[in-house]
Amino acid sequence: MAVGIENTIEEARFVEQARNFDIQRVIVKIGSSLLTNNGRGLDRTAIYEWAKQIAKLHKQGIEVLLVSSGAVAEGVVRMNLEERPKKLAALQACASIGQMGLIETWWSALIQHGIQSSQLLLTHDDLSNRSRYLNTTGALTQLLEWRVLPVINENDTITIDEIKFGDNDTLGAMAAAMVNADLYIILTDQEGVFTDNPRDNPNAKMIRQERAMADYLFDIAGDGGKLGRGGMLTKIRAGRLAAMGGCPTVIVSGAIDDVITRVVSGEAVGTLLTTNDQDKIIARKQWLAAHLRMSGSLIVDAGAAKAVVEHQKSLLPVGVSEVRGDFDEGDVVEIVHQDTGERIAVGQVNFSSRDACRVARERTEQFDRILGNNEERVVMVHRDNLALTM
């Protein structure tokens, strides 16, 4: 067990107790190891069983979105390959082949219960670009209004750096944010999050409930922890990302009988990662700090840099000396000190690059004259949407 964990975890966190959910919309993510019998091809029996559980929720009026891995593994089987390819082109080809079987199987399993399904293949670029993000959200909203169940997967055929273990955990969390889901369920091959690896330590306890932002979770599931190789780290990170939008996450074994319906009904199976208003802000800042793709740059003077870094203030337009790049309102940009050239923060900007150029170096009282329309925006980047990087 990680150092200090005994003193960090309260016994109440191990107690089975009913969970009071009010769920209208749920995301269910199922990993490759469950879907493919650990790489031996799609487990159609299991898929049909999960479809039956999803159908029960559907009949109750609960909207379900499914994030399904397994395309690459199914492609390997269909091509009779002895092992998973290492070359990117071969991985992408396997994803293209396997995706056909994956969607075909889910469609067949769901249509038996009168549920129409659809395929949605996404990349991180689709979700980091505001215009495509809004288009994707609109499509998902329409599908749900039509009572169609979206089956979402990473578009491994065209991505370069996203074919890696655990990525669909993140994709599911981002989908939860897009549609304002009430619950995110991650089905895995482990019963939940443990204080140690239960395969090695018979005294390991399963954590029944914890805040998604609890730091010690990374200690026991991080890269240096005993559970890191099992992919639990990506699931905890996904739980934190879901927390940013106020969505709780349950990490649970997909092999448990009626697991999906039992989780939604509030039964204490698996590990529940909870969130609150303060956690939303913390999680949002962590997500911003980890954002790899900047849409542009705001160059700020020394006074603005000091206000942001030392006093944790919002970035005001008057402190912005230069705007670089082409971005939309809501995109993530870097904030750079004009004297040192150092990135001091990243944040979600309240203006498009065009409008940001117009209000840069201007005081708030000038905004109506510059932009018109009774302009209500007063900050370039709000402090709740800003994360320091130095």
Swiss-Prot record:
PANTHER family given in the database record: GLUTAMATE 5-KINASE (PTHR43654), ISOPENTENYL PHOSPHATE KINASE (PTHR43654:SF1)
Keywords carried by this UniProt record: Amino-acid biosynthesis, ATP-binding, Cytoplasm, Kinase, Nucleotide-binding, Proline biosynthesis, Transferase
GO terms (BP aspect): L-proline biosynthetic process
Physiological role: Catalyzes the transfer of a phosphate group to glutamate to form L-glutamate 5-phosphate.
Its EC number(s): 2.7.2.11
Gene Ontology CC annotations of this record: cytosol
Organism per entry: Psychrobacter arcticus (strain DSM 17307 / VKM B-2377 / 273-4)
Any one GO molecular-function label of the UniProt entry: glutamate 5-kinase activity
Family label: Belongs to the glutamate 5-kinase family.
Protein name per its UniProtKB record: Glutamate 5-kinase
The PUA domain, residue ranges: 295-374
Gene name of the record: proB
Catalytic activity: L-glutamate + ATP = L-glutamyl 5-phosphate + ADP
